[in-house]
């Protein structure tokens, strides 16, 4: 029997607008973000606070989460998802969306699925970041040569603590046997009821 599990995939990123009233967190306008290509996150923690007595470390207050960065690589955002995470205004009559002073990037909740394998058995784990704020999106593109050069989009978001009583910055779901079951956990958390 394997002692651990190996990560074999990432899929189905979802996003929703975050709001909080007191310590009650809620989400609206949830939707599929794009098709997932790669996901990673880095966190910064405070230093451990050690107390010494009788010439030894007698007590320890472990470091806690301070901040983090979520990096998502996706195939490419559709207009609705880009407008949501970038806080963009309604398009002009000419169909143009203005990035400018009227833009207000909102806090969002983000969820996606990591796939694992252990002893030949596949499992799926939902990952949820209850409050993030996306950075302005940088883009690049290259002309097609002899073959298609598949070009992806990089998204970066600041990981923040939710305003719930626990000040949660991440949720990890139980392992489930199907991707659909993991997806259902994310959609329920983010208040997404449509298909």
Question: What are the residue ranges of the model-derived segments?
Answer:
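Short helix-loop boundary/capping segments
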Residues: 101-137
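Beta-strand elements of well-folded, non-transmembrane domains
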Residues: 74-78, 114-118, 133-136, 159-163
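Mixed-charge, glycine-accented linear interaction segment located at domain edges/termini
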Residues: 132-195
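Polar/acidic, low-complexity leader/linker segments enriched in S/T/G and N/D
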Residues: 1-41, 195
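Oligomerization/assembly interface segments of phage tail-like spikes and tubes
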Residues: 58-82, 149-162
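Exposed beta-sheet edge/beta-hairpin loop segments within beta-rich domains
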Residues: 62-63, 99-103, 118, 141-151
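N-terminal "mature-chain" segments and other terminal, solvent-exposed stretches
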Residues: 46-55
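Charged, amphipathic alpha-helical segments
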Residues: 78-101
């Amino acid at each position: 029997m394997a002692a651990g599990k190996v990560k074999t995939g990432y899929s189905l990123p979802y996003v929703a607008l975050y709001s909080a009233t007191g310590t009650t967190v809620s989400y609206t306008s949830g939707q599929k973000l794009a098709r997932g290509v790669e996901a990673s996150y880095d966190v910064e923690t405070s230093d451990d606070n050690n107390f010494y007595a009788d010439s030894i470390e007698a007590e320890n207050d472990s470091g806690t989460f301070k901040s983090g960065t979520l990096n998502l690589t996706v195939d490419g955002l559709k207009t609705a998802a880009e407008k949501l995470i970038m806080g963009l205004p309604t398009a002009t009559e000419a169909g143009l969306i203005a990035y400018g002073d009227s833009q207000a990037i909102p806090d969002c909740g983000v969820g996606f699925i990591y796939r694992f394998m252990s002893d030949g058995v596949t499992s799926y784990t939902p990952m949820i970041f209850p409050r993030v704020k996306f950075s302005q999106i940088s883009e690049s593109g290259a002309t097609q040569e002899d073959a298609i050069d598949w070009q992806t989009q990089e998204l970066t978001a600041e990981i923040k603590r939710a305003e719930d009583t626990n000040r949660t910055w991440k949720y990890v779901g139980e392992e489930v046997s199907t991707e659909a079951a993991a997806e259902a956990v994310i959609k329920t958390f983010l208040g997404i009821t449509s298909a």
